């Protein structure tokens, strides 16, 4: 039984749209997480992504019976992070259990320090994102990005400062 994301937030849990990132950080993890935050906040895009995930991840397994397992949101976040960082499962295991902002993105509160992901759980669940499924997700997300760019269509203006430097170069 998989859910997209648990409907009831826990005490101390921060909504994905309210997570603050260090905008001056030059690391790639906050950039990836900001992209996922935009995906989560765009209702239409989020619905189409999760409709695809629900239909493609273990389609023969009953969605109503069994234990809950990882949420589809957690699988998506871990899979995107693993691919964008070109990380192996050992690094992903360390990140999802220790990185504070990533744990907020996965839906853990400040009081969930004792909750951690097992290595094999990550391997089994992130492995459900096949290359074919990732290609379909990529198409949906790129179309959403193109719609975002089309909203801001207008006159493009550019500025640059330039000057001519006289040089005496001999080859």
Region annotations inferred by a language model:
Residues 1-51, 55:
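Charged, often Cys/His-bearing segments associated with DNA-binding zinc-finger transcription factors
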Residues 50-67:
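Short, Lys/Arg-enriched N-terminal segment that forms or immediately precedes the first helix
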Residues 66-74, 114, 155-156:
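Secondary-structure capping and boundary motifs in well-ordered enzyme cores
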Residues 84-94:
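Alpha-helix boundary/capping segments in eukaryotic regulatory proteins
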Residues 92-108:
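DNA-recognition alpha helix
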Residues 109, 113-171:
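Active-site- or DNA-interface-adjacent structural scaffold in DNA-acting proteins
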């Amino acid at each position: 039984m998989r859910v997209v994301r648990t409907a009831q937030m826990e005490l101390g849990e921060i909504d994905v749209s309210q997570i603050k990132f260090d905008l001056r950080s030059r690391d790639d993890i906050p950039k990836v997480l900001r992209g996922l935050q935009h995906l989560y906040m765009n209702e239409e895009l989020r619905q189409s992504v999760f409709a695809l995930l629900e239909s493609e991840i273990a389609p023969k397994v009953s969605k109503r019976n069994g234990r809950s397992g990882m949420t589809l949101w957690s699988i998506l976040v871990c899979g995107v992070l693993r691919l964008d960082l070109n990380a192996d499962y050992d690094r992903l295991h360390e990140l999802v259990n220790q990185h504070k902002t990533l744990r907020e993105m996965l839906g853990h509160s400040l009081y969930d320090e004792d909750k951690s992901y097992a290595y094999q759980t990550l391997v089994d669940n992130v492995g459900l994102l096949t290359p074919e499924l990732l290609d379909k997700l990529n198409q949906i997300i790129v179309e959403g990005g193109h719609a975002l760019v089309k909203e801001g269509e207008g006159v493009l203006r550019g500025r640059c400062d330039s000057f001519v430097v006289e040089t005496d170069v001999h080859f």
